[in-house]
Amino acid sequence: MKKADASARARELRDRIRAADHAYYVLDQPLLADAEYDRLMHELQALEAEHPELVTADSPTQRVSGAPSERFERVVHREPMLSLGNVQSDDELHEFDARVRRLLGLPDGEPVGYVVEPKLDGLAVELVYRDGAFTSGSTRGDGVNGEDVTANLRVVGGLGANRGVPHALEGRPPPRVEVRGEVLLFKEHFEAMNRQLVRAGEEPFANPRNAAAGTLRQLDWRVTARRPLSFIAYEALLPGGDPWRTHWEKLEELAAWGFETNAENRRCRGLAEVLAYRDRMAERRFELPYDTDGIVVKVDDLDWRRRLGAASKFPRWAVAFKYPPQEEATRIRRIWASVGRTGVLTPVVDFDPVRLSGAMVARATLHNEDEMRRKDILEGDWVLVRRAGEVIPEVVKPLPERRTGAEQPFRFPAECPVCGARVVREEGEKVYRCTGAACPAQLVGRLCHFAQRRALDIEGLGEKLAAGLVERGQVKDFADLYAVPFEVWQQLFSRPRKEQDAGAARELPEKSAQNMVAALERSRKTTLRRFLFALGIPQVGEATAATLARHFGDLARVMDADEEALKGVRDVGPETAAEIRAWTQEPQNRRVVERLLAAGVTPEAEVVEARGPFAGKTVVLTGGLSTMSRDDAKAEIERRGGKVSGSVSRKTYLVVAGEDAGSKLEKARSLGVRIAGEEEFVRLLKE
């Protein structure tokens, strides 16, 4: 592959992986199947290995994914909570073992001692104990910064679901210890909880991982207390270093302090025993009381671990082996087209229900016509399906040997199944679109996009409430939301609970309506970048919205910018500039924006805090940072009134030197410019 093509492909892969990371770790809504995510990550790793110059400090291959949510206080982990590299074949496990042996300088034939355990599918957390008492707890977040969920962790296990988070340690614990482990829902508790939700007319959770993550990150700890979460410990860290010789001794100590450790943990001498354990667990995985999608292999000797160390993202002494997804055969009942907010018709497959990874599954999407044709999927086909990553239902392939001749290809409708408008597929596009400007399905999708957390954050306004507003003719555009009478909200919340949104409040209709009105009132005060993202302008995602907000500063300048001005914005190309200009000059869109402003929605520019050590100063970044991406560092400096430059001069205030800093560092030294390492830079940001 030519360097230019490799660079473009690497950039595309990084963007897709970052989007998937955000959806999985921050929103708790998986975007990609695990197998697809792993394929993209492996492709990016291979590209960067072949072209080392393409490696960027903020590449997903260089740091743990999952930035902490803005809803909780940020916590800095004393030691980073690194994620694990994953492998999917015997060859890769052999490579891991060989690498460990090579780095340790072990003679041929000397086996490595490992501890192996099931890979739990929950939420990784850290608990801090002082003098045996639980004092604080946080999520892993991005590995360096997590979220403070102390109040919620205090009630994990409060229903007696299993051994939870001890408030006080047993035996003789050290003065301070950090305990790491997984918060999860056992299968029986998950199923019981979902039965209760269904009986109450509420939406059940899709899987135990989403349920555990969503429960632990509730703002109200009482919600967490009502759900049967469990905690399983697998790591302990002492400020002065490990007093234990092996990881196994550490696990025994954790049990002595009162923690639940995994009963399936085993010690193995050499890789052959690891492989035998892997095979046994693969056979038993669906019999276990919790969801698991693989095993974790860890070097047992703690001195060896210290010698092996860690790369920027993964420890060198551990790896996760992931099982291939479970697949089952079933028969397609029908294929139909759903309509999204942009008018795109997506083929949806309904099939006979099958149990996959402990859950009943009966529906999957096929993305577009090309994928359906490539997979050769026909209505009436027998197909193999799986829950890729144990989460997202996916049609893998048809079973043509079981065809009877009655199967038929699916044809996209000529008219929209919702509004009856003409459906078209433009030349060069992969998707069919509804051309109806007033299509109710598109309007519902746009309203949900407008109300989502990353846009105007109208809490409780989901698809079913939006559909109710559209059905009543109450809302025809975003601005109408702010004119919905209180009694209409009451009527919507008076419907049977099974018809309400899963995320909506579960109080009396009047209280729920009051909450919705309050959420709408809060949404009136927003930032320019959130507002621009909420409008759903074609090709304007969060990143582009933020760039436009920073470049233009106020809404009027964005709305009046011509194509040339838009092309002058960083990362906005000709196609995106044309799309933005076309949208802003459409009279109906301008009327909606004017009505939103008249309704009291005030999109304010980002406030620049022109104070502190960076105010009015020029800063240069060089090398990779482990605690944040280069873009994040740049944004933090600019938010404090500083300017980030790409070159060093005598006017440069500070050069921030990360890992593998290059020629800019040498030039700074020659000019006598102040140099700060990452630790000092983070400290300066806090001043």
Curated annotation (Swiss-Prot):
GO terms for biological process: DNA repair; DNA replication. The lineage of its organism: Bacteria, Pseudomonadati, Myxococcota, Myxococcia, Myxococcales. This is DNA ligase. DNA ligase that catalyzes the formation of phosphodiester linkages between 5'-phosphoryl and 3'-hydroxyl groups in double-stranded DNA using NAD as a coenzyme and as the energy source for the reaction. It is essential for DNA replication and repair of damaged DNA. NAD(+) binds at D34, A35, E36, Y37, D38, S83, L84, E117, R140, E182, K298, K322. It comes from the Bacteria. Keywords: DNA damage, DNA repair, DNA replication, Ligase, Magnesium, Manganese, Metal-binding, NAD, Zinc. Zn(2+) binds at C416, C419, C434, C439. Belongs to the NAD-dependent DNA ligase family. LigA subfamily. CDD domains: BRCT_DNA_ligase_like, LIGANc. GO terms for cellular component: cytosol. InterPro entries: BRCT_dom (IPR001357), BRCT_dom_sf (IPR036420), DisA/LigA_HHH (IPR041663), DNA_ligase (IPR001679), DNA_ligase_AS (IPR018239), DNA_ligase_CS (IPR033136), DNAligase_adenylation (IPR013839), DNAligase_N (IPR013840). Its EC number is 6.5.1.2. GO terms for molecular function: DNA binding; DNA ligase (NAD+) activity; metal ion binding. The active site is at K119 (n6-amp-lysine intermediate).
